[in-house]
Amino acid sequence: MSEISGIRREYTLGELHNEEVPSDPMDLFNAWLEVIRDSDIKDPTAMSVATVDENGQPFQRIVLLKRFDNHGFVFFTNLESRKAQHIANNAQVSILFPWHSLDKQVAVTGIAEPLSKTEVLKYFMSRPKESQIASWVSKQSSPISARKALESKFAEMKAKFSQGDVPLPKFWGGYLVRPKSIEFWQGGEHRLHDRFIYTKKEESWEHTRLAP
């Protein structure tokens, strides 16, 4: 096995001071996301979503953030997927935005709520047609024999939907994650990182600096 214990670097790209922390965490998230979007980070909206199964076993996967506002964070998925099955059983999830190349990360805990069909359809119709077709092809998280099976099914569905709009699959939808806590981490020199956690208190937020 490779020796990896010596892999490390200093975090020197910034600090997060008390006076720079706004009362609303979504304002800080928006400001950080703008910085990330202006950088050369690929997939700036990629986030890890963690769910747990009925035995308490956690699972993680990368999805794309598609919208955020004062209500929370939105993503879309196959409703027959493992993550959707987990959420149906336990709607408590966590999200992580791993912006490590800029020494930043944002960790969110919250409750995942299904989006309305109207919201889902609006987003689905904005997707490239090939992505819409792909939504019909994959029975997400189920075993398949080979990639060729997917490619054959895609070709079949592409021919089927060659004319007109691609309909929204009944098994495709999305979630709004309403945050209960949002933690911002800014890497610091000598491992003296800056951490601030926001906690939802009824309709307002409280924030606290945490030791690294």
Curated annotation (Swiss-Prot):
Belongs to the pyridoxamine 5'-phosphate oxidase family. Its cofactor is FMN. The lineage of its organism: Bacteria, Pseudomonadati, Pseudomonadota, Gammaproteobacteria, Alteromonadales. SUPFAM superfamilies: FMN-binding split barrel (SSF50475). Catalyzes the oxidation of either pyridoxine 5'-phosphate (PNP) or pyridoxamine 5'-phosphate (PMP) into pyridoxal 5'-phosphate (PLP). GO terms for biological process: pyridoxine biosynthetic process. This is Pyridoxine/pyridoxamine 5'-phosphate oxidase. Substrate binds at R8, R9, E10, Y11, K66, Y123, R127, S131, R191, L192, H193. The gene is pdxH. FMN binds at residues 61-66, 76-77, 82-83, 105, 140-141, 185, 195.
